[in-house]
From Swiss-Prot:
Catalytically driven reaction(s): N-terminal L-lysyl-[protein] + L-leucyl-tRNA(Leu) = N-terminal L-leucyl-L-lysyl-[protein] + tRNA(Leu) + H(+); N-terminal L-arginyl-[protein] + L-leucyl-tRNA(Leu) = N-terminal L-leucyl-L-arginyl-[protein] + tRNA(Leu) + H(+); L-phenylalanyl-tRNA(Phe) + an N-terminal L-alpha-aminoacyl-[protein] = an N-terminal L-phenylalanyl-L-alpha-aminoacyl-[protein] + tRNA(Phe)
Protein name per the record: Leucyl/phenylalanyl-tRNA--protein transferase
Domain of life: Bacteria
GO molecular function: leucyl-tRNA--protein transferase activity
Compartments, as annotated in UniProt: Cytoplasm
Residues of the signal peptide: none
Family that this chain belongs to: Belongs to the L/F-transferase family.
Protein encoded by which gene: aat
UniProt key word Transmembrane helix: no
EC number of the protein: 2.3.2.6
GO biological process, one term: protein catabolic process
Protein species of origin: Aliivibrio fischeri (strain ATCC 700601 / ES114) (Vibrio fischeri)
Coiled-coil intervals: none
Length: 239
């Protein structure tokens, strides 16, 4: 099947097509090209667009017809997860090891499955230096065993990836971030593509048109100051 796809011209452009122009097959594919500059990535996320492509492909930009999202105030950890965390030696931090989280999200996936290639890693680390990319870390004593990272767009957190090296680590990262995010007036966590794992954690489906409306509203509003200041979100290591 031949697909006609427009290209970002010039490659450093921050002007994207309207997301309603995305293809139906493959679902959500909008445009190709670009350079993953910080300005380009920030503009993309502000318009509900994210990069996702495989090694050897051009940069592909997506906005699927249905998003996976969390409303953090509705996130409810199971009793078993609460009990597990209470009895564990885990502790949870925010923005204490963002580079490590990005690296581990890439390296812990099978090579043929990962889209987090070296140029993506470098791009999101640059966004971290600019204060846009943030991470949640789960530790067992001094070992980093799980976490997630994503971008701050107003009152939305755009989740990029998560990893887990020990039982429940990524679930606990998400739970503790939801608690924190709500307390600082965060409203929505965008998971991009829905999948069974996210659904099992409580993610909801949202149509692209509804997401676009909510994005236009929430991207211009701010969380409470110091939301992303490096800090401890939960600590059982001394209990």
């Amino acid at each position: 099947m031949t697909i006609y796809l427009p290209e970002l011209i010039p490659s450093h452009s921050t002007v994207f097509p309207d997301i309603e122009n995305a293809l139906n097959n493959p679902d959500g594919l909008l445009i190709m090209g670009g350079d993953l500059s910080s300005k380009q990535l920030i503009s993309a996320y502000q318009h509900g667009i994210f990069p996702w492509y495989s090694n050897g492909d051009p940069i592909l930009w997506w906005s699927p017809s249905v998003r996976g999202v969390f409303f953090p105030e509705q996130f409810s950890p199971s009793k078993s997860l609460k009990k597990f965390f209470r009895k564990s030696n885990y502790n949870v931090t925010l923005n204490k090891a963002t580079y490590q989280v990005i690296d581990l999200c890439a390296s812990t996936r099978p090579k043929e499955e990962t889209w987090i290639m070296p140029e993506m890693i470098n791009a999101y680390k640059k966004l971290a230096n600019l204060g846009y990319c943030h991470s949640v870390e789960v530790w067992n004593e001094d070992e980093l065993i799980g976490g997630l990272y994503g971008l701050q767009i107003g009152q939305i957190f755009c989740g990029e990836s998560m990893f887990s090296l020990q039982t429940n680590a990524s679930k606990i990262a998400l739970w503790k971030f939801c608690e924190h995010f709500v307390s600082f007036n965060g409203k929505l966590i965008d998971c991009q593509m829905m999948n069974p794992h996210l659904e099992s954690l409580g993610a909801k489906e949202m149509k692209r048109c509804d997401f676009k409306t909510l994005l236009e509203e929430l991207s211009t509003k701010s969380t409470i100051a110091n939301c992303y200041l490096p800090q401890i979100l939960g600590d059982n290591s001394l209990s």
